Amino acid sequence: MTWKIIADSGCDYRQLANPAIDTEFISVPLTIQVADQVFIDDASLDIDKMMETMYATSEASKSACPSPDDYLRAFEGAKHIFVVTITGTLSGSHNSAQLAKNIYLEEHPDTQIHVIDSLSAGGEVDLLVEKLNDLIEQGLSFEEVVQAITAYQEKTKLLFVLAKVDNLVKNGRLSKLIGTVVGLLNIRMVGEASETGTLELLQKARGAKKSLQVAYEELIKAGYAGGRIVMAHRSNEKFCQQLSELLREKFPAANIKILPTSGLCSFYAEEGGLLMGYEIG
């Protein structure tokens, strides 16, 4: 195998439907610890069970990044390797991948490895993986793919919509009072990934209908113009379909993909949440 695209489970794909020629896609899982149980975020994970377990405990759940060894095993057998990780502000996965790259290149100096901090999660990571596959399919050199994906990342963004914030409260990132208000008043948190990879709140919207309109407005305001958008959702396909209809009224040729979130992205998005990656311009 000449090429490998490797992503941690900040990416929602377990496999690519149409991998480029001589290209293999590998998902390197994070683990999620809920009370005394550890869930490995691979293709065999029962995400529903993980979420049920998470909501049944008052303890804070936490994720653990892949080790450098996990990445080293994934590197084996390819000449040209691209790695995409969840934002370094949420996980040490990017650091593990960089360390693995340095170790691997000492032993395999002819291999080419490029590690990308997505500065994001979910749908935007999915977009970067899709684009890498497209660029390799075009027959570009490794250096040309690096240049093209770097430029492409400047034109992608993440918009998130959260219907529950239990995890944020349990982990001390939101106060219990705010968490209670969100639940009682049916508040949706609408936000984005910043340029430095932190998740920032844009608006609070009350109810699904209002949050749908707010999400649409934020996409347009940010520069979405009918290009690719990946709506990664945790048990909320209805919202995705409704948002797709709104977008297609304005952009009939919009390239929209809807898919379920990985275990890790379900952990962050929570029930009813979305992590949408989209192109601007």
Question: What role is predicted for each listed range?
Answer:
Residues 6-7, 85-87, 116-117:
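Short beta-strand segments
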Residues 10-26, 30-31, 90-93, 97-102, ...:
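Mixed-charge interfacial surface used for oligomerization/domain docking
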Residues 66-101, 105-106:
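Active-site cofactor/cluster-binding pocket
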Residues 47-48, 68, 129, 142:
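Alpha-helix initiation and N-capping motif
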Residues 4, 80-82, 228:
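Structural motif
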Residues 3-64, 70:
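N-terminal glycine-rich anion-binding loop in soluble enzyme alpha/beta folds
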Residues 1, 75-78, 222-225:
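Flexible, charged surface loops at secondary-structure boundaries
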